[in-house]
Design a protein with these regions (language model features):
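GIY-YIG nuclease catalytic motif and its immediate N-terminal context
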Residues: 1-51, 55, 82-92, 112-113
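A structural signal for alpha-helix termini and helix-coil/disorder junctions
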Residues: 59, 93-98
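Coupling/hinge elements of helicase-like and P-loop NTPase modules
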Residues: 97-109
Length: 113
């Protein structure tokens, strides 16, 4: 699934590499790791996008190529922390509806309160 099919669309993007970390805000939000062609590899949420971006760069599973491509883009939307699980679940459900499964790097269902 291409990033362009997500509703709502993530508002910002940076390259998924260390030199981009200063461009990521220290705010709550939902994010997507995507290939150069904008294919979704991972959907997540964080109360601090800046910290989460750096954590993912330290995770070999997130930085190494998958059979569906390599994470090149970090798309994100700053979002109210109370509603983060709902937005993440919405995006995951949209992906699941098209592919019948989670994105390749999403292993478990996120909780929704």
């Amino acid at each position: 699934m291409k990033i362009e099919k997500l509703i709502p669309l993530p508002k910002d993007k940076v390259r998924f590499k260390l030199s981009s970390f200063k461009s990521v805000p220290k705010e709550a939000g939902c994010y997507v790791l995507a290939t150069f062609e904008n294919d979704i590899l991972y959907i997540g949420l964080s109360n601090n996008l800046f910290t989460r971006f750096q954590q993912h760069l330290d995770n070999p599973e997130k930085i190494n190529p998958t059979k569906e491509g390599k994470a090149i883009w970090f798309y994100f939307t700053i979002y109210d922390s109370k509603n983060l699980p709902k937005l993440e679940r919405t995006w995951i459900n949209q992906f699941d509806a098209i592919h019948g499964r989670h994105s390749i790097l999403n292993k478990i269902n996120s909780p929704v309160s």
